[in-house]
Amino acid sequence: MSSTAVPTRRERQRQATYDEIVTVSRQLLRHGRDVSLRAVSAEMGLTAPALYRYVDSHAELMALVARAVFADVVGEITVARDRHPDDDPAAQIVAAVSAFRRWALGNREEFRLVFASPPTPETEALAESAAQRPITTLDGCVPEELGAHEFSAFFSDIFTRLWTKYRFPVPADDELPPGVLQVLSGPAEPGDKLATLGEVTPGMVWMFERAWARLYGTVTLEVFGHVHPGFITTGALFEATVLDIGRDLGLAGEWDRLQAIARG
């Protein structure tokens, strides 16, 4: 079917069933219930064999759910970003990471699924494959599966514009630990949008990785209640983390206005 063709009735019905499968699965997930093929089929009034006409396995079911969750996350952080002009990437990135935190705290089970689930044989195979390739772009920090690539690309775009505007210090190759340089070195891939800047270096990708690790670590600790509740309700730990990252990215002088954005 061409991209402009009108879906047939059968195709529309099949898509509607997929949408219902994802909706029911997410409802089960949000209520802390088992998201199994049997449970989903029961909620939909189907037999398990009937559900297998749409999904082949539990892994495929969870992949469908994960893609839907990532789409929602990217949608929310996009709305937050777009409240600020493109020539203010500092405001955009603070607004986006704050929206990500709010989403995570409000959707703990979905956060657990896409950001904190233990590896499966399928995801381990993807990770092993990715480990054989050097990271040459910011959005190459996340393997392209389950919608995670779009999430990473969203932040890599803002991060690149931040560097273009603020020119924050980036470590040279000889300042990076050997193990880090080995992972981050390699020829740029044809068509990489970042390669057109002529400025993407292992040090820049390392800065991106470190910023994400600190942000993700803080949000994960908050989501699972591994810090004092007062730090979560006040947002103090998150704000301190964003400020620490901001210092590395040349934004310390703008913290007063950015803090107001972080508090939303």
What are these regions (language model features)?
Residues 1-34, 39, 56-63, 68:
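Basic, helix-initiating cap at the start of DNA-binding domains
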Residues 153, 157-264:
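C-terminal peripheral helix-coil segments that are non-catalytic and often amphipathic
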